[in-house]
Amino acid sequence: MSSPDNSSPSLRIPPWLRVKLPCSHTFADTRALVEGLGLNTVCNSAKCPNMFECFSSGTATFLILGNVCTRNCAFCNITPGHVSPPDPDEPRRVAEAAARLALRHVVVTSVTRDDLDDGGAAHFAATITRLRAALPAATVEVLIPDFRGDHAALRTVMAAAPHIVNHNVETPPAHYARIRPQADYRQSLELLRRVKAAGGVAKSGLMVGLGENDTEVEGVLADLADCGCDIVTVGQYMRPSRQHPPVERYVHPDTFESFAACGRGMGIPFVFSAPLVRSSYNAESAYNALCTLRRKPA
């Protein structure tokens, strides 16, 4: 597949990636509530381009287990370095924030904690349990690390019964040594297979603009379809700072639509593919759409 994309990292950000900042009291209120409870959000820590829209609608993706990571993925804006012990009160505060925001769909992610024996799985489980008790009508989505391939850690998370388990593969395997040097593509696929085998809703995602080509993206979609992924997100990589890898190409919206059609053709029920799509963006809509599809008669 060829695509009408701009492959020069020196050119300006195209107009379809320019975000209009909304004026909203809800944005300020959401941010104040989260910060007042001593919580982190991936929206702020990762400089997500959708933060203003999400905060203005009263939603957020909670970042647990601190805001310092034990890994140093090239694309990520979260600081690597020395980490602190998990805060045992954090699950309660996440649930309190979600309840005060009256969330219908709660997304929880974390930094990678290779220093912990279980990679933070028990902390995830405690957070899920607290959320389900505080908001029994809400759905809970977790975006988890790979737990270094620890199957017992994944079982701990699954036992807490999250509605969606998301684990992003991020980029095609040929680029892992440069972009995700401490991760393993096949290990990530195996995690997703195990989520499906346990009866869970499996979700994954990747970015484009990190040096991959369209054929490689289609290869990742094929792998995710083979894993049985229910939901896949594809979005544009945006360079957080000059210390991060430059954007290799800005992918045209038409090409994103082609990726979505390709993934659906491979059997993935929902592929959300657009320049500003991120793994947590419109997460509630994606889950509701999947539930609607499953209720339809064959």
Curated annotation (Swiss-Prot):
Needed cofactors: [4Fe-4S] cluster
Residue ranges of domain Radical SAM core in the record: 55-269
The keyword Aminoacyl-tRNA synthetase belongs to this UniProt entry's keyword annotation: no
NCBIfam families reported for this sequence: lipA, PRK05481.1, PRK12928.1
Superkingdom, natural source: Bacteria
The organism of origin for this protein: Nitratidesulfovibrio vulgaris (strain DP4) (Desulfovibrio vulgaris)
CDD domains named in the record: Radical_SAM
Sites where the protein binds [4Fe-4S] cluster 1: C43, C48, C54, S280
One Gene Ontology molecular-function label: 4 iron, 4 sulfur cluster binding
Protein keywords: 4Fe-4S, Cytoplasm, Iron, Iron-sulfur, Metal-binding, S-adenosyl-L-methionine, Transferase
Protein name per its UniProtKB record: Lipoyl synthase
EC number: 2.8.1.8
UniProt family annotation: Belongs to the radical SAM superfamily. Lipoyl synthase family.
EC top class, as a word: transferase
Gene Ontology CC terms, in alphabetical order: cytoplasm
Lineage of producing organism: Bacteria, Pseudomonadati, Thermodesulfobacteriota, Desulfovibrionia, Desulfovibrionales
